């Protein structure tokens, strides 16, 4: 095989039966063992909620995020590089769409995604919520649903694409070390943006979630500007947005090729965005 990095690669047969793994995965969200109640969206103790400084744009959807670590396992902390997650980690992302943007009273559960660190590597799974909003079913193939949404300009139809397992891995690639959200720049923020001063990374450290906690105060660690608060300079906000939303493809090792290079630390003159 040829690749964008100019190297040649050879395929190697995997020893694991992927079809057997797929068939064994729980078919309903309520069967995963992570929820005390899917109807109330109540996770069992051990699921740690988190938020990020720059959320990935998701067609007006709101998201709730959780980390679930296996018993006794810890995260390998890195200031700049990707965090290292142990086998058995489950990253949960729950998507909701407001069907009435004027009154914010029409919240609809769309899907709940699992990103699972298995012995064979990372795997993505999508659960699609039923009409009763009581449970969600494991998706086998990608599909699209259309929702009617009330806006200030009238009612519109909004399509929503539910990704297949292969779709998940189109963005969560080896070039990005697979995990896109939980890293130092994204997670270095208040645990509760609405109040309190506890830092999210500091809280994770106090909970014993890191095998190697930060050696410097969290105030000295790098962070993206808070996108929703609009903090930071325009340049920093734009570079953070492009890094989060685009650089997993548009970077030297990404599937979009070497140019443009939209990583956060690439000097502007080397990004190929201007000039």
Regions found by a protein language model. Give the residues of each.
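N-terminal pre-domain segments of enzymes
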Residues: 12-69
């Amino acid at each position: 095989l040829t690749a964008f990095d100019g190297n040649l690669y050879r395929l190697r047969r995997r020893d694991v039966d992927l079809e057997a793994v797929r068939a064994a995965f729980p078919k309903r969200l309520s069967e995963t063992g992570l929820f005390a109640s899917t109807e109330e969206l109540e996770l069992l103790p051990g699921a740690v909620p988190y938020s990020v400084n720059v959320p990935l744009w998701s067609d007006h959807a709101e998201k709730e995020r959780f980390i679930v670590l296996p018993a006794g396992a810890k995260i390998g902390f890195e200031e700049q590089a990707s965090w290292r997650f142990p086998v058995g980690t489950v990253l949960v992302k729950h998507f909701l769409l407001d069907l009435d943007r004027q009154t914010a009273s029409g919240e609809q559960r769309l899907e709940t995604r699992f990103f699972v660190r298995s012995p064979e590597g990372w795997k993505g799974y999508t659960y699609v919520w039923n009409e009763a909003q009581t449970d969600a079913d494991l998706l086998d193939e990608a599909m699209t649903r259309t929702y009617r949404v009330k806006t200030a300009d009238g009612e519109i139809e909004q399509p929503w694409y539910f990704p297949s397992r292969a779709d998940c891995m189109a963005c969560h690639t080896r070039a990005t070390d697979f995990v896109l959200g939980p890293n130092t720049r994204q997670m270095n923020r208040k645990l509760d943006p609405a109040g309190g001063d506890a830092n999210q990374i500091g809280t994770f450290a106090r909970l014993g979630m890191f095998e190697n906690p930060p050696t410097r105060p969290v105030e000295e660690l790098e962070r993206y500007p808070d996108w929703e608060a609009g903090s930071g300079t325009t340049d920093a906000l734009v570079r953070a947005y492009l890094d989060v939303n685009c650089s997993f493809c548009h970077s030297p090792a990404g599937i979009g090729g070497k140019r443009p290079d939209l990583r956060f630390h690439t000097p502007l003159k080397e990004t190929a965005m201007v000039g």
